[in-house]
Regions:
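N-terminal targeting or regulatory segments adjacent to alpha/beta-hydrolase or S9 domains
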Residues: 1-69
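A short loop-to-beta-strand scaffold at the N-terminal edge of the catalytic core in hydrolase folds
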Residues: 66-82
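Short beta-strand element of the alpha/beta-hydrolase
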Residues: 87-96
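Catalytic nucleophile-loop/oxyanion-hole region of alpha/beta-hydrolase
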Residues: 102-104, 109, 123-158
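Primarily recognizes the serine-hydrolase "nucleophile elbow" in alpha/beta-hydrolase
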Residues: 142-215, 229-233
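Short beta-strand/loop motif that positions the catalytic acidic residue
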Residues: 244, 249-252
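Conserved alpha/beta-hydrolase "acid-adjacent" motif
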Residues: 256-263
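Catalytic histidine neighborhood in serine/cysteine hydrolases
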Residues: 269-276
Length: 276
């Protein structure tokens, strides 16, 4: 069954070499100064069109409709490791983009790098606004379940890590702190598998809306940070860490608010969860 996904290796190589998902900064905004979201999504859709995709819900995504014609139903692109017998594990990669667009290099380029490092990789295409952050979390959780369900068929090995950047890092942290081990009674076979990742790599994610105000300059009433105090606490990664949380690697850039990484690192330290 892996054969049909092997074409994704060459397609990914070509996409990275030709900068298929990269737009010059000058084209990121329209003349009026607003983000050119339509141009971004059209570029992503065109670049990903030839890939063999795995839809997250074969019978249709719950709650999905045609409110945004530029958004396909959520999927991931599976890219087999160069050597299946020596595979180092599986990494589910989630791009950033503020939940409004898709930062292509944080998806395709990252997947290509880790493919060449000996990993199976899967590029997640999750729902954006007007869908909610909870919808995007459900997409990543479903992708993890599928990878667990396909472990033997796709020769994935035991370990699955999530790796995200910016908004994708926020999703990775949420899925590392909100998970289950599957429902054995579910009629949907995929739902019988758990959605806990074995590790999470979080790149410059806005971790919290409660430990300190306005992460990354986002207003506290931004719905992507939660509507109401209960949602804000649920989505604040550091508030949901416990001793069963998987290990994490946290990193940020010099221009990011360092409190994001530090508040999560402190929570992991307090819970005695390994982190770097």
């Amino acid at each position: 069954m892996l054969e049909k996904y092997r074409k994704n290796i060459e397609l990914l190589k070509q996409a990275v070499e030709t900068d298929a998902v990269i737009r010059p900064i000058a084209k990121h905004r329209k003349p009026d100064g607003s983000l050119d979201i339509e141009g971004n999504l059209l570029l992503w859709n065109k670049a990903l069109e030839p890939f063999e995709k795995t839809r997250l819900w074969e019978q249709g995504t719950p709650g999905f409709d045609d409110r945004d014609p530029l958004q396909e139903e959520p999927y991931f692109v599976f890219v087999p490791a160069p050597d299946e017998e020596k595979c180092r594990g599986t990494i589910l990669v989630a791009h950033g983009g503020g939940f409004t667009w898709r930062t292509g290099t944080e998806g395709l380029n990252v997947a290509w790098y880790f493919h060449n490092a000996g990993f199976h990789t899967a590029i997640l295409c999750y729902r954006l606004v007007p869908y909610t952050r909870f919808d995007a979390i459900a997409d990543m959780q479903r992708a993890i379940r599928i990878l667990r369900a396909k472990r033997e068929e796709w020769k994935l090995g035991e370990k699955i890590a999530v790796m995200g950047f910016s908004a994708g890092g926020m999703l990775s942290g949420n899925c590392a702190t909100h998970y289950d081990f599957g429902n054995p009674q579910s009629e949907d076979e995929t739902e019988r598998f758990g959605c806990r990742p074995d590790a999470a790599v979080i790149g410059y994610g806005a971790m919290t809306a409660v430990t300190f105000p306005k992460p990354f300059g986002m207003m506290q009433d931004d719905p992507m940070m939660g509507n109401g105090i209960e949602e804000k606490f649920y989505l604040s990664i550091e508030k949901n860490v416990d001793q069963d949380t998987p290990p994490m690697f946290i990193w940020q850039t010099m221009s990011d608010d360092g409190r994001n990484g530090m508040c999560l690192a402190k929570a992991l330290q307090d819970a005695e969860v390994p982190y770097r």
